[in-house]
Amino acid sequence: MWPAIIQQLSEQLGKDFHLVEKEKVHGGDINECFMVSDGIDRYFVKTNQREYLTKFTAEVENLRVMRESNTVQVPEYILHGTSKTHAYLVLNYLATKPLDDAERSYEFGVQLANLHRWGEQKEFGFDIDNYIGATVQPNPWHKKWALFFAEQRIGWQLQLMQEKGVNLTNINEFVEMVKTRLANHSPRPSLLHGDLWFGNVANIVNGPLCFDPACYWGDRECDIALAEWFGGFQPEFFQGYESVWPLDWGYEERKDIYNLYHVLNHYNQFGGHYLDEAQKLIEKILSY
């Protein structure tokens, strides 16, 4: 694997890359990640089995469109490819620390709101299907938000659970209920990070950074709801966001529907206590 990476990196840079340092670094639960250096420049390398190339290709597109918005900082794409046995993605390496101070948190809130305001997309979805963690995230274009979220988010995850032999509710009935609950909410399509938990943001020398996106055009409230559910963000993050674009009336009820998508996905990936959490959240939503 490493000879292939070094060769492609040399070709991309237009000069020989001589590997003088390679250090394993934290990069989540899915990929094996490294910092590599030629003694001058440093790069962040994600690796996995060869079949993961489709995931890395999707991540490249996610990062591209977020960078195009010129609103938030994301890692710079260098290259991706495969060896005989592995797939890899190379980004610029950035020294990070937690996004835990008030000023930078507020700044990121402002940046996220500007990301959500960017663009003039008329429909909900994305140009490609991508991944939320290790799970395929289908993104066919829809004109109606309620239809998109009910079918391509909630219905999709419930179907994946059913294939595992788990039936929390009648899928068709619950999907129709979600459509009804969201029918009177007509958000403008916003470019979403899509997986905005505290572990996917950081602080670097020149400001906040976000990474590992699962982008699509959807209701901006989905990003905020997930940030609340996972926790870790400073209050100033939410204050910064609302200083630019206050949340709409009804968000407190909609956020449970939006976060159900992530709870279901966590069960489909990790199992365990997320099943009980999903059941309780479904019961809460049905009780409204």
Swiss-Prot record:
Which InterPro entries did the record assign? Fructo-/Ketosamine-3-kinase, Kinase-like_dom_sf
Q: Tell me if Kinase is a UniProt keyword of this record.
A: yes
Q: Name one Pfam family in it.
A: Fructosamin_kin
EC top class named in words: transferase
Provide the GO MF annotations for this entry.
ATP binding; kinase activity
Active-site positions on this chain: 195
Q: Which UniProt keywords apply?
A: ATP-binding, Kinase, Nucleotide-binding, Transferase
Report what the protein is called. Answer: Probable ketoamine kinase VC_1539
